[in-house]
Amino acid sequence: AERIKNWNIEKIYCSDLKRAMETAAIINETLNVNIVVESQLREIDFGEMTGHSDEENAKYFAFFQKKLKSRRCDLAYPGGECGADVYQRGFPVINKIVHGSTGNVAIVTHGGFIRCMLAGILGMDFAKKSMFGKNMENTSITELDYDTDSEMFTLERFNDYTHLEGKPELLRSSWK
């Protein structure tokens, strides 16, 4: 919150998943603006892989993960979503937020969702979304600028977590 307190954020939008709502509430202790919860900002649905450790998923879904890493096609997670599904679900709310705002907004969401939105917004094949990295740091900042004249987005910042410097316990690499 300290990092963005001077960015003139007019509203916070967040996913309806618990961790996103908790993060939005923490940010709002500093910003004191309205929070709007949008279910369409949820993380990609990992289907049958949800709730399992990376090790379990590597063991039980090895064939799927190998195909996913090939980046040849946009695969749906077993029983879940593919990148295009997430984009079709999420972009309408992003569009509504952009066109319904007069200033800066913060969107608190999830790494998989962000990668899918970026792939779609930047015109990439959804199979290539993993080019944005396997994991994003929690509380990292990805910044898009929307130009109303050209109706185009520009990626200004991606997975920026410099505000976590000096706090290694908060980084993914410290998780056991």
Predicted regions and their residues:
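Acidic, low-complexity terminal tails and accessory targeting/binding regions
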Residues: 33, 44-56, 119-176
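Short, active-site-adjacent cap segments at secondary-structure transitions
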Residues: 19-21, 43-45, 113-115
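Active-site-proximal alpha-helix that buttresses catalytic centers in soluble enzyme cores
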Residues: 1-33, 37
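Short beta-strand scaffold positions
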Residues: 14-15, 88, 108-109
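Short, high-confidence coil segments that cap the C-terminus of an alpha-helix
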Residues: 9, 101-102
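Residue-level preference for the first positions of well-ordered beta-strands
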Residues: 102-108
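Active-site catalytic microenvironments for nucleophilic, acid-base chemistry
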Residues: 3, 30, 96, 100, ...
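Phosphate-handling substructures
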Residues: 29-91, 154, 175-176
